[in-house]
From Swiss-Prot:
Functional description taken from the UniProt entry: Confers DNA tethering and processivity to DNA polymerases and other proteins. Acts as a clamp, forming a ring around DNA (a reaction catalyzed by the clamp-loading complex) which diffuses in an ATP-independent manner freely and bidirectionally along dsDNA. Initially characterized for its ability to contact the catalytic subunit of DNA polymerase III (Pol III), a complex, multichain enzyme responsible for most of the replicative synthesis in bacteria; Pol III exhibits 3'-5' exonuclease proofreading activity.
Name under which the protein is recorded: Beta sliding clamp
Domain of life: Bacteria
Assembly information from the UniProt record: Forms a ring-shaped head-to-tail homodimer around DNA which binds and tethers DNA polymerases and other proteins to the DNA. The DNA replisome complex has a single clamp-loading complex (3 tau and 1 each of delta, delta', psi and chi subunits) which binds 3 Pol III cores (1 core on the leading strand and 2 on the lagging strand) each with a beta sliding clamp dimer. Additional proteins in the replisome are other copies of gamma, psi and chi, Ssb, DNA helicase and RNA primase.
Protein's organism: Vibrio harveyi
Assigned protein family: Belongs to the beta sliding clamp family.
Source lineage: Bacteria, Pseudomonadati, Pseudomonadota, Gammaproteobacteria, Vibrionales
UniProt xrefs under Gene3D superfamilies: DNA Polymerase III, subunit A, domain 2
């Protein structure tokens, strides 16, 4: 697996997905983020087994398909610490991911992607559409619970 992406395209979706992870995970894999590259799309998935968040970013340029998990907190901290206009390259080498940007180099331990829990998609026969204001009102009325 290999891909290159601008920090500005990565940081916001990465922060949103990392929000699914709580404090201390019960299983080591739950502290990781699933990175999957296929068809010039990077998908990032995080879960705590109750909630799963997925964010997708279109990749420009060369990439190699694949999937792996990386420590979410360390990965986010590395990306946050890089300058806004950075170009970040990720290369899977054995059981480690090399994160490179300019003269900076980081190496992160990985866990296999097939160890990452898969919350299955489900389809409902019932569909509900709400406006943003209606949803907000409903949440505010039940927020005390």
């Amino acid at each position: 697996m290999k891909f290159t992406i601008e920090r500005s395209h990565l940081i916001k979706p990465l922060q949103q997905v990392s929000g699914a992870l709580g404090g201390r995970p019960t299983l080591p894999i739950l502290g990781n983020l699933l990175l999957k590259v296929e068809d010039n799309v990077l998908s990032m998935t995080a879960t705590d087994l109750e909630v799963e968040l997925v964010s997708k970013v279109t990749l420009e340029g060369d990439f190699e398909a694949g999937s792996i998990t990386v420590p979410s907190r360390k990965f986010l901290d590395i990306c946050r610490g890089l300058p806004d206009d950075s170009i970040i390259t990720f290369v899977l080498e054995g059981d480690r991911v090399q994160v490179r940007s300019g003269r900076s180099r980081f190496s992160l331990a990985t866990l296999p992607a097939n160890d990452f829990p898969n919350i299955e998609d489900w389809q409902s026969e019932v569909e509900v559409s709400l406006t943003q204001s209606d949803l907000r009102t409903l949440i505010e009325k039940t927020q005390f619970s």
